[in-house]
């Protein structure tokens, strides 16, 4: 019954103890689980999932586990229930030694997100060890003269258990001379001493055999015994005496071996051998003390034998005995404590619990990269550890617990600037001098598609000569992307503009992998001069990014078009007859060859040359004007002359064409050139012809007067102006004005605005474009005269005698008048207004695209001249162009192609400045009146 009560009492004590331990952890702010030592595998320690408020369903996914290799050998976590279980039995004595408390810190780590939890497990001691004496037989010698009350220290027993399970008492077998006294040291250990209660009498009893028992406080208690043999010695009545009963010294843990720590002194008043004192360690001094310290037997010097380690043991306490040489020998003992002073001899060590090897560059600031713990076994300030990383890195350290840190991102990451980081973590203690440890964490930055492809230029200009071969490489549009992987793979595509009629894909092809632009067909400058398109570079990221570049392609002109003769024009292989009055002098204008070239620039700059003639000395051809004149006076009996005029451009190689003129005196031209005007009656006589001419002259005067009055009235209604008739037979209203704005157009009237210095500033041809039929050759008879037409439609029955067949004037070549899109920018205008003479020299613009515009304007001017429109009265330097080209464009730098426009039957050319330079008035377009041998019919 008594045993049953005791068992219930023990159970209650254990339950109370476990309850106090469990709740003590919560009071201290830390979860602590008590568990008895030597618990079997699978023993329940605590439910960490419940205590850490974790979802048990996600424990497997988050991989809840115990951190640290040492702790993983003893504990494990059940991922199904979240329970902390014993993995291997724990021996408290092997784990914590003789420490009063055995606390094992545990760290738990979860993933997704990465988190750490801390708890403690207290290993509760179990009374599984019995006290044991160093030896089973203890020998003690006591002089018979020892007085009662003298104490003799005994070797104490050792118990591996701690706390209440350690040694709690000593017992001595019953006897009449000795008693047992137990002293408690500062560390809580008990030291037995033998107390002499009665004087000894060696003669009665020389030795005593006693039993010494050590009992622990476990339940049930365990005990250990040793035999104590006491020998009674002969009288030595003075024992050695120490100066003090206990000594305490301090020494640095870094003290070198061989250092003398203390010298003990003991005196014995006896003489002889009884006064010789010998020092030695007491019998119960542990071996670890004997291995560290050496005690000289005669001098009492305590010498250090090996290195000290404050972190392993911070003090040593043992007994030293002094014995004399008497018989029996007498001895005395003292207590010696050696305290170790901590020295900063241990550098901190860093443990990276968990780290991410790769981090995307889009990670937000505050993302956990690694969990770091630091430890320093030193004490005090030597164990205070601080952690740091380089300042220039976009990372920071956050303190979670004591000596626990989290490495997080502190700013944005850019893989293109830095693709990996070697983060050196430095742990330093606060010792003097401080010690530090380095640990490098390697982190790779994964790419995110945050950079669009970029071209080296925002726009490209490509120049390609016409007549190129299909498939030729035009340009290579390379784009770069600082991203990596698929984010840096670039594909190219052609963007078609919506507002353009010409599709760029019909001219070029784009390689989607390399960005190379190839021509799909041959370019023709006369059809396409420029081509603009956009190319898009797009990466393969998610989402994809892109950029565009504008490409301007300019087609360069090649000399692939031969000059075309506009006037005089004959069918291929035929002659173009030209009439020459008899007995003309030198310098007489026979005709003017007008040619154009569809090319541009120097390729369109034509020159004229007399290639073939029966007598080249009779004729001269102006090199650039194309005027065919007589070089010497022509005799009256000159036979017909066949002149071959070659027209050649300035290209490389130059191209040319030719026109053949048949120049003959007027009597020889009538059989060659048929008269288009049919006569309904035979010629009668000179008197009748004179009558017809007189009637015609009167009619023409009336018509001219009426036209003049009508023109004058219109000019007076529109603005104050003066009427001026030009040599070509065209009248215009001239207005002097200092204002720069032009006059509004009016139908059927040529308006010319003059500046204060008389040059023409504004020309406007109103009304419809009427064709002027070329007049017949100059009449040779005295009663013939030249008829001048008004700008209106030709009158019925009007006599016309063209020098070339009218149907062949343009030979199927129709030149449309220039539209309003042909405008010159300020940078393309050759110069200020001024007159241009009809010399053979001239400067061509250097810019090919300026000359392209000028080429079109020249064609338009030549077309107007060929049609005989009123624009022939243009001002100097304007080449007879209409006002739509602006008064500021005078073509000073272009050869005067007005000289290439020739009006048959007239010596006038398209210039009004020659008269000013020569000091003469321009010649009339109707020439001299001469009689003809033929009748003219209205």
Swiss-Prot record:
List of glycosylated residues: 265, 276, 444
InterPro entries per UniProt: Cadherin-like_dom, Cadherin-like_sf, Cadherin_CBD, Cadherin_CS, Cadherin_N, Protocadherin/Cadherin-CA
Biological-process GO terms, alphabetical: cell adhesion; homophilic cell adhesion via plasma membrane adhesion molecules; negative regulation of neuron apoptotic process; nervous system development; synapse organization
TM ranges: 693-713
Extracellular topological intervals: 30-692
Effect seen on changing residue 606 to G: In NEDGS; uncertain significance
Intervals, Cytoplasmic compartment: 714-938
Residue stretches making up the Cadherin domain: 30-133, 134-242, 243-350, 351-455, 456-565, 572-676
Biased amino acid composition, Polar residues: 822-847
Residue ranges, annotated region (Disordered): 791-847, 908-938
GO molecular function: calcium ion binding
Claim: Transmembrane is one of the keywords in the record: yes
Biased composition regions of type Basic residues, renumbered to the chain: 928-938
Pfam families: Cadherin (PF00028), Cadherin_2 (PF08266), Cadherin_tail (PF15974)
Localization in the cell: Cell membrane
Keywords recorded for this protein, A-Z: Calcium, Cell adhesion, Cell membrane, Disease variant, Glycoprotein, Intellectual disability, Membrane, Repeat, Signal, Transmembrane, Transmembrane helix
Record-linked SUPFAM superfamilies: Cadherin-like
Record's bilayer topology term: Single-pass type I membrane protein
Transmembrane helix among keywords: yes
Role, per record: Potential calcium-dependent cell-adhesion protein. May be involved in the establishment and maintenance of specific neuronal connections in the brain.
Disease: Neurodevelopmental disorder with poor growth and skeletal anomalies: An autosomal recessive disorder characterized by global developmental delay and impaired intellectual development apparent from infancy. Affected individuals present with progressive microcephaly, hypotonia, delayed walking, poor or absent speech, intellectual disability, and variable skeletal anomalies. Variable features include seizures, non-specific dysmorphic facial features, oculomotor apraxia, and non-specific brain imaging abnormalities.
Protein name, UniProt field: Protocadherin gamma-C4
